[in-house]
């Protein structure tokens, strides 16, 4: 696509969930939000930030075998270095470079239980400058994926107040960016899927 390249994943609830499935769905969402909200000093790579995403899952004794995210090229490859998020260096991957302004990186934590189910929430983040002060140049991310996270999979009791605010703010952004392009029926659907929790 000459307009650019994107990568997105959503898991949608299609029936009743067990308590375990709902806990995993909620924790994946929390992991995604935590990384997206990072503020960090210039010079960090995804190796420094990966724990923000994996942390909630590691607290449960769960991990996913892949990286948390990868760089995204423009009219090139969907998976492209030198940026990415993972907790350890993998020699054959070119994804441990410093995060620079304008780099786009996916944020895609997940839970994958063989023979049972998989859950992933994936957005794209663009690295932007935040404030500069006596400690140095701070960086942060802006979310550039505008698709709702299925609230039927979320247990608000498993989220902190901060995480609920982040999810509500994300859904407000989705509504504001997407609703002007939809017809009445589509707007009603989006309104339900971006409601506050």
Regions found by a protein language model. Give the residues of each.
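Active-site neighborhoods and metal-handling regions in enzymes and metal-associated proteins
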Residues: 1-197
């Amino acid at each position: 696509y000459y307009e650019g390249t994107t990568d997105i994943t959503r898991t949608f609830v299609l029936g009743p969930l067990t308590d375990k499935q709902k806990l995993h769905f909620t924790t994946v969402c929390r992991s995604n939000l935590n990384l997206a909200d990072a503020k960090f000093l210039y010079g960090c790579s995804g190796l420094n930030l990966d724990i923000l995403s994996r942390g909630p899952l590691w607290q449960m004794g769960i991990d996913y075998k892949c990286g948390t995210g990868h760089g995204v090229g423009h009219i090139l490859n969907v998976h492209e270095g030198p940026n990415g998020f993972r907790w350890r260096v993998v020699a054959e991957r070119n994804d441990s470079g410093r995060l620079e302004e304008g780099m786009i990186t996916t944020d895609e934590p997940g839970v994958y239980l063989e023979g049972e189910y998989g859950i992933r929430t994936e957005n794209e983040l663009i690295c932007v400058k935040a404030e500069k002060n006596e400690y140095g140049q701070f960086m942060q991310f802006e979310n550039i994926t505008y698709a709702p996270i299925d609230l039927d999979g979320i247990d608000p009791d498993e989220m902190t107040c901060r995480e609920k605010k982040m999810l509500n703010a994300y859904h407000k952004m989705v509504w504001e960016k997407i609703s002007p392009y939809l017809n009445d029926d589509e707007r009603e659907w989006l309104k339900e899927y971006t409601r506050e929790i």
